[in-house]
Amino acid sequence: MQPPAFYVTGTDTGIGKTMGSTALLHALRARGHTAVGMKPVASGCERTPQGWRNEDALALQAASNPQPAYATLNPYALPAPLAPELAAADVGVTLSLEPITQAFAQLRAQAEVVVVEGVGGWAAPLSATLDQADLVRALQLPVVLVVGVRLGCINHARLTAAAIAADGLQCIGWIANEVDPQMERVEENIGMLRQRLAMPCWGRIPWRPDAEAAAQAQGLQLPR
């Protein structure tokens, strides 16, 4: 059964969590659902007349229907492109769960499904006292893992899946996102991932860097 919200994490930073998240939003919308994205913490923002804005969070906003207010979608917009703990310290901000849980509740009231995108890889902390696992527990979310398909991805995927399970949380699916156009034997690597990951594969996003998120969504097969 389709969960009303889930948390998207990745095998590392830069492996396409946002691509996976926006594709999920479009796939959900194609099924007739209202679906909105959320980026609780984003580091690496640009100053605009409307305030600090993050490229990934804006992509989630554009892929959402209805489109939520930016401050609700991205409660913590941190200027420096650093680990959240460092980026928050640079501007004297202490990250806490309450603003995130309040924003999440607002998004849940606006749409049938909320796609929450995490930061970096699973073990990347949010603050000195807050891990992503703490946030996922607070929001009571299952996890979807985006696997960046490149050399080393089998090790990274298995380690990430094991870490999620060790935190007592449920990973309900994974997405293969091709990030290296030079990688050899992609099909075999994805086949090995299918054999070794306990959760089902929700589809594959091919290497098409200029493709729109709606087109990338065509490679996904979400559970009913």
From Swiss-Prot:
InterPro entries: DTB_synth_BioD, P-loop_NTPase. Mg(2+) binds at T18, D56, E117. Its main location: cytoplasm. GO terms for cellular component: cytosol. Its cofactor is Mg(2+). It is found in: Cytoplasm. Coiled coil: none annotated. GO terms for molecular function: ATP binding; dethiobiotin synthase activity; magnesium ion binding. Substrate binds at S43. Gene3D superfamilies: P-loop containing nucleotide triphosphate hydrolases (3.40.50.300). Its EC number is 6.3.3.3. GO terms for biological process: biotin biosynthetic process. Pathway: Cofactor biosynthesis; biotin biosynthesis; biotin from 7,8-diaminononanoate: step 1/2. Keywords: ATP-binding, Biotin biosynthesis, Cytoplasm, Ligase, Magnesium, Metal-binding, Nucleotide-binding. CDD domains: DTBS. It is an enzyme of class 6 (ligase). HAMAP family: BioD (MF_00336). Homodimer. Belongs to the dethiobiotin synthetase family. NCBIfam families: bioD (TIGR00347). This is ATP-dependent dethiobiotin synthetase BioD. It comes from Xanthomonas oryzae pv. oryzae (strain PXO99A).
